Amino acid sequence: MPKRDLPWRSMAGTSKVSRNANYSPRAGIGPRINKAAEWVNRPMYRKPRMYRTLRTTDVARGCEGPCKVQSFEQRHDISHIGKVMCISDVTRGNGITHRVGKRFCVKSVYILGKIWMDENIKLKNHTNSVMFWLVRDRRPYGTPMDIWTVFNMFDNEPSTATVKNDLRDRYQVMHKFYGKVTGGQYASNEQAIVKRFWKVNNHVVYNHQEAGKYENHTENALLLYMACTHASNPVYATLKIRIYFYDSITN
């Protein structure tokens, strides 16, 4: 028995509607991709030969795997006078967190945590910014210099810090960032998340000592300087700092 023609078949100018049509109001909402984005995110086989053959390797040049990691977890009391810590302290050994010999390359640095104020300070109406500097010390000696010795500041303000002219050859600022917290009874922002990941490719050299200390560095120590801009209200920073490094093949 043939099917009966439905009323919409006899109407002029109508077309059959698919059952799979999506009438959801969200159907037309989605990420718009233009030609520029498609070109930037094009697959590797559509790129020139130079991009396909000259890709950087995961292992740093002159090094060998596996990728090792060292973590520094600490709560810091950051004041206006600043603080410094060495993040290239790696003890000599055979573990996944140790260096095999004198030389290794820090491939990348990962900083994760937050800056926050205590109960008494967060009730005061003020804004405080915490400045961070990742510095490479090319010729480390003795103990790390404090922030006032390395940086030149106008009116004792850490936000205007630049490396002193006579120390520019030794200290090199690799990265710089800041986090801001605000105190008060109403529109307060008492804590701020800190999250940074950098590729540094820093080749560190130790002496014959096994302990991972700043005084045992001979070349390219990594230092993290911290200071807040408010003179009377300190800030706390709970940070986990991880360095990913490879041992040198010349050890």
Swiss-Prot record:
<keyword id="KW-1140">T=1 icosahedral capsid protein</keyword>
<keyword id="KW-1048">Host nucleus</keyword>
<keyword id="KW-0238">DNA-binding</keyword>
<feature type="short sequence motif" description="Bipartite nuclear localization signal">
    <location>
        <begin position="3"/>
        <end position="20"/>
    </location>
</feature>
<keyword id="KW-1163">Viral penetration into host nucleus</keyword>
<keyword id="KW-0945">Host-virus interaction</keyword>
<dbReference type="GO" id="GO:0046718">
    <property type="term" value="P:symbiont entry into host cell"/>
</dbReference>
<keyword id="KW-0167">Capsid protein</keyword>
<keyword id="KW-0863">Zinc-finger</keyword>
<feature type="short sequence motif" description="Nuclear export signal">
    <location>
        <begin position="96"/>
        <end position="117"/>
    </location>
</feature>
<comment type="similarity">
    <text>Belongs to the geminiviridae capsid protein family.</text>
</comment>
<feature type="short sequence motif" description="Nuclear localization signal">
    <location>
        <begin position="35"/>
        <end position="49"/>
    </location>
</feature>
<dbReference type="GO" id="GO:0039615">
    <property type="term" value="C:T=1 icosahedral viral capsid"/>
</dbReference>
<feature type="zinc finger region">
    <location>
        <begin position="63"/>
        <end position="80"/>
    </location>
</feature>
<feature type="short sequence motif" description="Bipartite nuclear localization signal">
    <location>
        <begin position="195"/>
        <end position="242"/>
    </location>
</feature>
<dbReference type="GO" id="GO:0003677">
    <property type="term" value="F:DNA binding"/>
</dbReference>
<dbReference type="InterPro" id="IPR029053">
    <property type="entry name" value="Viral_coat"/>
</dbReference>
<dbReference type="GO" id="GO:0075732">
    <property type="term" value="P:viral penetration into host nucleus"/>
</dbReference>
<dbReference type="InterPro" id="IPR000263">
    <property type="entry name" value="GV_A/BR1_coat"/>
</dbReference>
<protein>
    <recommendedName>
        <fullName>Capsid protein</fullName>
    </recommendedName>
</protein>
<keyword id="KW-1160">Virus entry into host cell</keyword>
<keyword id="KW-0479">Metal-binding</keyword>
<dbReference type="InterPro" id="IPR000650">
    <property type="entry name" value="Gem_coat_AR1"/>
</dbReference>
<dbReference type="GO" id="GO:0008270">
    <property type="term" value="F:zinc ion binding"/>
</dbReference>
<dbReference type="GO" id="GO:0043657">
    <property type="term" value="C:host cell"/>
</dbReference>
<keyword id="KW-0862">Zinc</keyword>
<dbReference type="GO" id="GO:0005198">
    <property type="term" value="F:structural molecule activity"/>
</dbReference>
<comment type="subunit">
    <text>Homomultimer. Binds to single-stranded and double-stranded viral DNA. Interacts (via nuclear localization signals) with host importin alpha-1a.</text>
</comment>
<keyword id="KW-0946">Virion</keyword>
<comment type="function">
    <text>Encapsidates the viral DNA into characteristic twinned ('geminate') particles. Binds the genomic viral ssDNA and shuttles it into and out of the cell nucleus. The CP of bipartite geminiviruses is not required for cell-to-cell or systemic movement.</text>
</comment>
<dbReference type="GO" id="GO:0042025">
    <property type="term" value="C:host cell nucleus"/>
</dbReference>
<dbReference type="Pfam" id="PF00844">
    <property type="entry name" value="Gemini_coat"/>
</dbReference>
